[in-house]
Amino acid sequence: MQKKIIVYTDGACSGNPGKGGWGALLMYGASTREISGYSPATTNNRMELSAAIEALETLKEPCIVHLYSDSSYLVNAINEGWLKRWTANNWKTAAKKSVENIDLWQKILTLIKLHDVTFHKVKGHSDNPYNNRCDELARQAIKNNR
C-alpha cells in the first residue's frame, strides 16, 4: 500500500527576476520534514515549480501525494489541462508562443507519473500555517544567501 503524503510548497523571489528561494513541508503521519533551497538568478514561477519538484524528488518510493500550493501557475497547469495541451502542441501555448520553464515542467511530468499527485490551490499569505511556513522557508533561503 502506498504511503499518503501531504506536501505544501511555496516559492519567493527578491525581484522578479532576481534571487529566489523555495520551501516545502512534507507530512507523513505525525512526521514533518522541512526542505528549502536557493537560486541566485531566477523568477517566482521557477521557484514555485522548483519547490514542487524538490518535494516530490525527496520521496524515496511512489506515494499518494496531496500537494498544496498558492501558485495558480502550477496548480492550473495541472488541474486545468494546460500541461497536457502544451505537450500535445510541442510545448507551445494556445497563442503559439513557447512555453516558459519547459525544463521544470518536464521534471514535473516525470514525477507525476511516478507518484499519484493531486494538486490543490491554497490562498497565499493568509491564515494557512503550512503555506505560511513554506513562505518563511523560501524567504529565509534568500536571506541566508545575501
From Swiss-Prot:
<comment type="function">
    <text>Endonuclease that specifically degrades the RNA of RNA-DNA hybrids.</text>
</comment>
<keyword id="KW-0479">Metal-binding</keyword>
<keyword id="KW-0460">Magnesium</keyword>
<feature type="binding site">
    <location>
        <position position="135"/>
    </location>
    <ligand>
        <name>Mg(2+) 2</name>
    </ligand>
</feature>
<feature type="binding site">
    <location>
        <position position="70"/>
    </location>
    <ligand>
        <name>Mg(2+) 1</name>
    </ligand>
</feature>
<feature type="domain" description="RNase H type-1">
    <location>
        <begin position="1"/>
        <end position="143"/>
    </location>
</feature>
<comment type="subunit">
    <text>Monomer.</text>
</comment>
<dbReference type="InterPro" id="IPR050092">
    <property type="entry name" value="RNase_H"/>
</dbReference>
<keyword id="KW-0540">Nuclease</keyword>
<feature type="binding site">
    <location>
        <position position="10"/>
    </location>
    <ligand>
        <name>Mg(2+) 2</name>
    </ligand>
</feature>
<dbReference type="GO" id="GO:0003676">
    <property type="term" value="F:nucleic acid binding"/>
</dbReference>
<comment type="similarity">
    <text>Belongs to the RNase H family.</text>
</comment>
<dbReference type="InterPro" id="IPR036397">
    <property type="entry name" value="RNaseH_sf"/>
</dbReference>
<protein>
    <recommendedName>
        <fullName>Ribonuclease H</fullName>
        <ecNumber>3.1.26.4</ecNumber>
    </recommendedName>
</protein>
<keyword id="KW-0378">Hydrolase</keyword>
<dbReference type="InterPro" id="IPR012337">
    <property type="entry name" value="RNaseH-like_sf"/>
</dbReference>
<dbReference type="GO" id="GO:0005737">
    <property type="term" value="C:cytoplasm"/>
</dbReference>
<dbReference type="GO" id="GO:0043137">
    <property type="term" value="P:DNA replication, removal of RNA primer"/>
</dbReference>
<dbReference type="GO" id="GO:0000287">
    <property type="term" value="F:magnesium ion binding"/>
</dbReference>
<dbReference type="Pfam" id="PF00075">
    <property type="entry name" value="RNase_H"/>
</dbReference>
<feature type="binding site">
    <location>
        <position position="48"/>
    </location>
    <ligand>
        <name>Mg(2+) 1</name>
    </ligand>
</feature>
<dbReference type="GO" id="GO:0004523">
    <property type="term" value="F:RNA-DNA hybrid ribonuclease activity"/>
</dbReference>
<dbReference type="InterPro" id="IPR022892">
    <property type="entry name" value="RNaseHI"/>
</dbReference>
<feature type="binding site">
    <location>
        <position position="10"/>
    </location>
    <ligand>
        <name>Mg(2+) 1</name>
    </ligand>
</feature>
<keyword id="KW-0963">Cytoplasm</keyword>
<dbReference type="InterPro" id="IPR002156">
    <property type="entry name" value="RNaseH_domain"/>
</dbReference>
<keyword id="KW-0255">Endonuclease</keyword>
